[in-house]
Amino acid sequence: MSDSHLTAFDKASKAGFIIALGIVYGDIGTSPLYTMQSLVENQGGVNQVSESFILGSISLIIWTLTLITTIKYVLIALKADNHHEGGIFSLFTLVRKMSPWLIIPAMIGGATLLSDGALTPAVTVTSAIEGLKAVPGLSHIYQNQTNVIITTLVILIVLFGIQRFGTGFIGKIFGPVMFIWFSFLGVSGFFNTLGHLEIFKAINPYYALHLLFSPENHRGIFILGSIFLATTGAEALYSDLGHVGRGNIYVSWPFVKMCIVLSYCGQAAWILANKHSGIELNPFFASVPSQLTVYVVILATLAAIIASQALISGSFTLVSEAMRLKIFPLFRVTYPGANLGQLYIPVINWILFAVTSCTVLYFRTSAHMEAAYGLAITITMLMTTILLNYYLIKEGVKPFLAHLVMTFFALVEFIFFWASAVKFMHGGYVVVILALAIVFVMFIWHAGTRIVFKYVKSLNLNDYKEQIKQLRDDVCFDLYQTNVVYLSNRMQDYMIDRSILYSILDKRPKRARVYWFVNVQVTDEPYTAKYKVDMMGTDYMVRVNLYLGFRMPQTVPRYLRTIVQDLMESGRLPKQEQEYTITPGRDVGDFRFVLIEERVSNARQLSNFERFIMQTKASIKHVTASPMRWFGLQYSEVTLEVVPLILSDVLKLPIKELVPVEDSEA
């Protein structure tokens, strides 16, 4: 990593500051919409809260933001960048060589992040639209929750519908809008606290600890389930590291934290001033002057949409990384934007839309959604803590110190998990079931890959080089193609899948001028694009290792085109002049890609469990993108050949010949 790149990544700028507000802080920045409402409603309403309860609640929020968001994520996790990229899968690629079992927390963390994220657009948009109940001219319409639901669904339909076109055209306004949003949070919160400056006593952690064990707290330790809502967006700070750079997060986080803390303090001051009024509105909107409410609702809705957009984009990135790490099925990925970071996965987009819409229809109100929200993200944070522990050790921190620091955070997060576990029976089971389904798919995909590696036999290419040369020169066979390309998942030195050599020599001898054996390896670095070539001492057999970062598209034909030109220019590969062509001077022949799919035969070597894994994986493949799409072969000549997973499992079955009886013997 060059010093210039490091400096650019770590330094801040005015533009970077604004961009960070629009990308990184959407989730945590919209938490004031519903966190205080959840605390008050779980206490029994505004008229049931006391000054000590409010002080304790604000103190818990402040210290939760400080311990988890500021110390763990901003000060520790942001250091764990994988070539400027963050997120749980980037962190996993940094430490995966330290222990094979680390794939487990990576899969669990990724699954829970995706599942809990499906709830975020529902909670934030519904909370914003419910603010219309406080608008004098619209309150009679939106007191009917059905109208809130309809409006929310319309916004979600538009939001998910525009994903296919890319969001670069509206992304430019995200930063300025969120700057206005955070400024409003800070200013309105500050003015609301002027009548109750004693609210700032909440900075003292004594009030937080006192509330946890106070009889005034009707929920005891389980109040932390609502407190945790204030910091659910902390994981996004780390996940979006690569989009904005570490320096911009360092500079923008103090501003964001100050604004949201002032907003919580302002809502708390309003509650203290109105606890005997009997008003049962969301404290966030109720604390705003009535003549400004409609504008605040519009601003809150925009902030909720931006938060949802950031989450949707983050989900696409998370899934694409999982696919390239071979722990998730392959789905079609498109790039509607001008850069690789703006990707779109249609299947994931509409699954998210379906889950989010069903969440709105099932829970109906933001209060009911809040009861289920946050449970899965506590698990994500715990999994990140486990991986961070290994990262610190890898970076030279003494194991005892690393274990001590991460055990502290794990203990804090486990307490939040325990406090949030009560949400399971109040709707939390929805995100848990979704997370388990995602983990199941990841496990099947990962285990299936390991089984294939276990049973597929490999042969040495050098042992068959002479046969392939004879086939190449044998005019008795028609020319199958000028260039035949085999994509292999497993190619260690000269060892290659037996099924590939079987396809060339046995199944139907494939005569070609050049045989290509291509293996794509996903690197720990996000944006690697390198290759290594071995001509094997010939001009007709080419071993190609493509080294692509886990965020790079695996469009093999485009890379291969460059490699062919390089080899011909260096004289390692003879030019393939074309007698008939509409392109004058064309010196590259035609290509055919052969894809080999291993399917489970009636293999006796497979255990029942392994058979279940492989059959389930085969079923999942029916709804996933084909390898042809994944490797960018839609416009190439492709042959798909199916072979049994275990070629050697062809046993002679006993059978007797019936000898016809002659008439004379009858």
UniProtKB/Swiss-Prot annotation:
Topology term for the membrane: Multi-pass membrane protein
Keyword Chaperone attributed: no
Catalytic activity: K(+)(in) + H(+)(in) = K(+)(out) + H(+)(out)
One Pfam assignment: K_trans
InterPro entries noted in UniProt: K+_transporter, K_trans_C, K_trans_N, Kup
Major subcellular site: membrane
Keywords, comma-separated and alphabetical: Cell membrane, Ion transport, Membrane, Potassium, Potassium transport, Symport, Transmembrane, Transmembrane helix, Transport
Cellular compartments annotated: Cell membrane
Transmembrane segments: 16-36, 58-78, 100-120, 141-161, 165-185, 221-241, 253-273, 292-312, 343-363, 373-393, 399-419, 424-444
GO molecular function: potassium ion transmembrane transporter activity; symporter activity
Domain of life of the source: Bacteria
GO cellular component labels: plasma membrane
Function: Transport of potassium into the cell. Likely operates as a K(+):H(+) symporter.
Family note: Belongs to the HAK/KUP transporter (TC 2.A.72) family.
Name the record gives this protein: Probable potassium transport system protein Kup
Gene: kup
